[in-house]
Amino acid sequence: MITDIVGYSKLSGDNQDVALELLKEHDKILFDLHDKYNGNILKNRGDGVISAFNSSSDCIRCAVEIQRKLKRRNALNIKERNLNIRIGIHYGEYVKDGNEIHGECINFASILEPLAPHGGIAISEQLADIVDKKNDIYI
C-alpha cells in the first residue's frame, strides 16, 4: 500500500502550522489502522506511507477504513482543514535495503496511487482478481 496526502506540499507552503496538525492526525489514523489490520509501515514518506500486509484482504480492509474514517473526519471540519489521501495497492515481494524499498509491487502501487481520486483507492486488476476469488471482499 502506498498513500499520499492530496495537496500537502501546497498546504505546507501556505500554512505550515495547519499542515503539521493535519500530518499528526494523518499519522495517528494510519498508524492505528495499520496496527488493527496487522500492517507493517515500511517507510514514512512524510505525507504518506509505504506499507505491507500479510493478507491482501487485510490491506484492502485497512485502506477502506482509512478512507471512511477520513471522510467522517472531513465532514466535521471546514474545507480548508480537510484531509484527503489517495491510496494505491498492488501485491508481491519487495526488498528493504536500509531506508529504501524496492520491488515491482512498490513500483506498481506508486503508479496506481496518483490514479486514485481524492479520498479513493486504486488497486491493480491482478489483486482484484485474487481477492475476488477468495469471495471475502466485494470489489
Regions found by a protein language model. Name each.
Residues M1-C62, K69:
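Catalytic NTP-binding/metal-coordinating core of nucleotidyl cyclase/transferase enzymes
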Residues K28-F31, I50-I139:
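Catalytic beta-strand-to-alpha-helix segment of the class III nucleotidyl cyclase homology domain
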